[in-house]
């Protein structure tokens, strides 16, 4: 039983989205490249009823194959999601990944960095599509990350007919699959990505989201399948207020990114997590992207504690000004080899050459004939390796750490210090997610309950409000019901004299129960409250004691004066 509650985290966003992926909350942890969104990270999030996308970008095919094999055994099918990043210089890599995911029956991808459909993406959507009694149905789902209307349009319409035809001619699709896919939108869900870490157009969410949502509604008037597309919001989300703003805009789900890198389960080094936890507003910069270097595409990165943004920009300026490696001055070569590469340019080229020989021999053949392309490949070696130095925590490369990150990290740091999540070692990914969702629900609830017109002032001073404190028995029964619901057993099976640890409640579930308890009692509570008391009986007895008022604060703003335990 809960009192005076109209909004819960489970009600935020679209029920349709939660049902699609079997989620308790409409919350997604977006993919973080190079396995930063690790297997452990995905398992923790999906185990808490949330969605997370494995960060396959930048990993070898063998590494991704191993990750898929592990996740298939530990993650519910509907929640298994792998990042599919567009690889304009390596179409074979993209196609091979799609073939792997289809072969392993991975039913959802988070598609990122796509500007338009590709054969590989269309193949993933169309394979297994059929027309049933309920109409056309896809066997695989696509969650597309976009920031511009013209890109979003591609995902709201059916796959291009010429691509479906070509895949049929290749024997990759049957005629019936192509026909069914031609009646579906390319994507099930579209994330409007605002000012995010990594690839970003630095779009403000307040402008980008309504524009893309309106496009969905416009297209749905002539193409009914588009009406089923959920529109989510991502980029810049690092506090409960930010999530609440996204839901208030009409987001069907929210996506976080930067903030997850500093969580316990993230697949990056402790040094990177420490830098992220110290980030303040203004500690971010744009730098050239490794995957689209020649096109001038940029990514948002952490500037604090690293020289990467400055050095990467210098490489791009060299690329624009020089015709090839042989055109570099002696001073430029010396600086490259000593400060950035920490090895000779020839050694870098040999390593780069071996990589392209394995993944895309055609690109290597072009580079052998084009000095400028060869120079770009060498420079991209630094851009890619700087991420690996950061992830591994290589102390020799500390000044060159490339850490994809956006301003949400700074706002998250400021908020987290007040809720017991200020240190990386305290940041369990599910606990962070659930604390944000609980906070967003409280934020919206408070806003929507606030009176729009101030009541007239009485000539007589108002009597202090009467506050009814729930008794120990009521709180005890409430806690039993909450824990029973959380671990899916009957309330009668809960022994309130047993330690909390015996119920198998993780930190994420504890945070969620704590948020509900705060609203029930109309007071703020210690973030570690549940672990400070031996059992339900002891906690209920303490919470039923009168609240010690803080001078000058109304009842609802009092901090429960609870000893450490």
Feature locations, PLM:
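Residue-level detector of anion-binding/catalytic polar loops
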Residues: 51, 107, 252-253, 524
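4′-phosphopantetheine-dependent carrier domains
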Residues: 460-565
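Active-site entrance/lid segments in N-terminal catalytic domains of soluble metabolic enzymes
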Residues: 1-228, 258-260, 394-403, 407-459
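Glycine-rich beta-strand-to-loop/alpha-helix junction loops that act as flexible
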Residues: 230-238, 256, 503-505
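Charged, amphipathic alpha-helical linkers/stalks
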Residues: 110, 279-344
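Catalytic or ion-translocation cores adjacent to nucleophile or general acid/base/metal-coordination motifs
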Residues: 195, 241-300
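Short glycine/serine/threonine-rich phosphate/pyrophosphate-binding segments
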Residues: 37-40, 239-243
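Domain-length cofactor-binding catalytic modules of enzymes
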Residues: 317-458
């Amino acid at each position: 039983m809960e009192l005076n509650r109209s909004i819960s985290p489970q009600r935020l966003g679209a029920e349709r989205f939660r049902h699609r992926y079997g989620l308790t909350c409409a919350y997604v942890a977006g993919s973080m490249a190079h396995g930063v969104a690790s297997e452990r990270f995905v398992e923790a999030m999906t185990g808490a009823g949330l969605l997370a996308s494995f960060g396959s970008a930048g990993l070898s095919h063998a590494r991704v194959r191993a990750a898929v094999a592990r996740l298939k055994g530990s993650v519910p099918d509907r929640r298994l999601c792998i990042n599919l990043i567009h690889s304009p210089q390596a179409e074979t890599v993209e196609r091979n990944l799609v073939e792997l995911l289809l072969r392993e029956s991975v039913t959802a991808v988070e598609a990122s960095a796509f500007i338009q459909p590709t054969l590989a993406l269309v193949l993933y959507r169309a394979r297994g599509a059929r027309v049933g009694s309920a109409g056309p149905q896809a066997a695989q789902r696509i969650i597309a990350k976009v920031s511009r209307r013209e890109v979003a349009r591609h995902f709201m319409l059916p796959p291009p007919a010429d691509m479906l035809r070509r895949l049929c001619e290749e024997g990759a699709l049957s005629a019936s699959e192509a026909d069914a896919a031609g009646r579906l939108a390319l994507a099930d869900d579209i994330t409007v990505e605002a000012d995010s870490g990594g690839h970003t157009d630095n779009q403000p969410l307040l402008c980008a989201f309504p524009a893309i949502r309106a496009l969905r509604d416009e297209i749905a008037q002539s193409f009914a399948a588009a009406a089923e597309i959920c529109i989510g919001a991502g980029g810049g989300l690092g506090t409960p207020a930010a999530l609440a703003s996204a839901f208030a805009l009409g987001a069907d789900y929210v996506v976080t990114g930067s903030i997850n890198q500093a969580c316990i389960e993230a697949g990056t080094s402790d040094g990177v997590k420490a830098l992220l936890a110290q980030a303040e507003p203004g500690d971010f910069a744009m730098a050239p992207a490794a995957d689209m270097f020649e096109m001038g595409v940029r990514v948002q990165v952490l500037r604090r504690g690293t020289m990467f943004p400055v050095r990467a920009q210098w490489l791009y300026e060299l690329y624009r000004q020089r015709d090839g490696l042989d055109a570099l001055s002696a001073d430029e070569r010396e600086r490259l080899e000593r400060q950035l590469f920490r090895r000779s340019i020839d050694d870098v080229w040999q390593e780069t050459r071996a990589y392209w020989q394995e993944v895309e021999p055609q690109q290597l053949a072009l580079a052998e004939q084009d000095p400028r392309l060869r120079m770009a490949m060498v420079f991209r070696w630094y851009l890619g390796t700087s991420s690996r130095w950061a992830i591994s925590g290589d102390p020799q490369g500390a000044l060159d750490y490339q850490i994809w990150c956006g301003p949400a990290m700074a706002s998250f740091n400021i908020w987290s210090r007040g809720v017991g999540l200020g240190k990386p070692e305290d940041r369990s990914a599910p606990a962070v997610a659930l604390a944000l969702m609980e906070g967003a629900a409280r934020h919206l609830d408070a806003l929507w309950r606030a009176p729009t017109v101030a009541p007239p002032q009485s000539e007589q001073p108002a009597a202090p409000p009467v506050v009814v404190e729930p008794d120990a028995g009521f709180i005890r029964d409430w806690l039993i019901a909450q824990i029973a619901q959380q671990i899916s057993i009957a309330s009668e099976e809960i022994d309130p004299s047993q330690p909390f640890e015996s119920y198998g409640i993780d930190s994420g579930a504890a945070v969620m129960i704590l948020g509900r308890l705060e609203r029930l009692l109309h007071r703020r509570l210690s973030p570690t409250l549940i672990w400070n008391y031996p059992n339900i009986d002891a906690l209920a007895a303490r919470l039923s004691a009168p609240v010690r008022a803080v001078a000058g604060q109304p009842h609802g703003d009092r901090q429960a004066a609870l000893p450490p335990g």
